[in-house]
């Protein structure tokens, strides 16, 4: 047990430093190319911080643990929205630009509707489903690139001091590697610790693994807040949620199709269909609707999301 605990701590340290460098590199690139930080957060930063989910879900699917691949994607969306974004909002509520949110939010709900449709109608995620999800990922990237080209940065961003481009790319790349390695150490050794304590695999997937693979987003969000880049944090969370459904699930399903696990029920029905997917929609609606309609996020909103996440975790360990 000592070695897993030590490796768990090493993974956490890698995540913290990796998140710090990744934010520095991403914001430097945003300033250099006059791109709004929220758009950078919704694409470049999201890809880097979603790498752990891609690796964990793909490995799980290939080794016959489809319940982990499935639970990791949904659990990470819930964790990102109701824990990570909630912390960001509760600590530093403020205004957001609704226009910059429309594309990632729209793509998320289109992907989520397709994902839920497959879950409720067949319960089987086949290779064609994975390819459709990957096509959505490509479309999302294209739309964001076009938006970046057509959206000028605010005046203060254009006047910001720029560092060496090679250094910014280096920070971005090294940060992404540290994030991926750190998350891998955290999930592998954290799962060993959880299994030693007798926690079921399905619960591990929706809570522990989801939280572990979402730690890069959490570290990036906290680092962004500390550096005063709240827009980058929110954009990263929403972008990561899109990637969890279209990239993480797309890759794992395309490589190793799986069916929804049936080992947990509520009132005789599949627990995922009764609770997990509805909660995923609920927390994203609570996170995004006020931002789109009012252009701001409030502290009560963040607290409400945190309460939902706490209740979700409690139910997972009691059903």
Tell me what each language-model feature is:
Residues 1-319:
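Hydrophobic alpha-helical segments, chiefly the membrane-spanning helices
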């Amino acid at each position: 047990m000592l070695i897993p605990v030590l490796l768990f701590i090493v993974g956490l340290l890698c995540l913290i430093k990796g998140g710090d460098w990744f934010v520095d590199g991403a914001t430097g690139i945003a300033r250099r190319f006059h791109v709004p930080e929220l758009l950078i957060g919704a694409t470049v930063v999201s890809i880097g911080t979603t790498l752990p989910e891609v690796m964990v879900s793909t490995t799980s699917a290939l080794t016959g643990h489809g319940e982990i691949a499935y639970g990791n994607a949904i659990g990470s969306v819930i964790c990102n929205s109701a824990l990570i974004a909630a912390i960001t909002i509760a600590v530093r509520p403020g205004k957001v630009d609704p226009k910059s949110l429309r594309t990632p939010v729209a793509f998320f709900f289109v992907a989520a509707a397709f994902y839920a449709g497959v879950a409720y109608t067949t319960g089987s995620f086949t290779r064609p489903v994975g390819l459709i999800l990957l096509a959505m990922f490509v479309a999302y990237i294209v739309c964001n690139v076009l938006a970046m080209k057509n959206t000028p940065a605010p005046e203060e961003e254009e006047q910001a001091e720029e560092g060496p481009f090679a250094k910014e790319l280096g920070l971005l790349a090294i940060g992404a590697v540290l994030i991926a390695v750190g998350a891998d150490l955290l999930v592998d050794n954290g799962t060993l610790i959880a299994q030693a304590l007798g926690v079921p695999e399905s619960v591990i997937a929706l809570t522990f693994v989801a939280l572990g693979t979402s730690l890069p987003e959490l570290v990036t969000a906290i680092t962004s807040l500390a550096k005063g880049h709240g827009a980058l944090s929110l954009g990263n969370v929403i972008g990561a949620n899109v990637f969890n459904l279209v990239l993480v699930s797309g890759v794992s399903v395309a490589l190793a199709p799986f069916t929804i696990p049936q080992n947990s029920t509520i009132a005789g029905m599949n627990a995922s269909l009764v609770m997990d997917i509805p909660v995923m929609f609920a927390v994203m609606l609570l996170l995004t609707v006020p931002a789109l309609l009012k252009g701001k996020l409030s502290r009560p909103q963040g607290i409400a999301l945190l309460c939902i996440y706490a209740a979700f975790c409690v139910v997972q360990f009691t059903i």
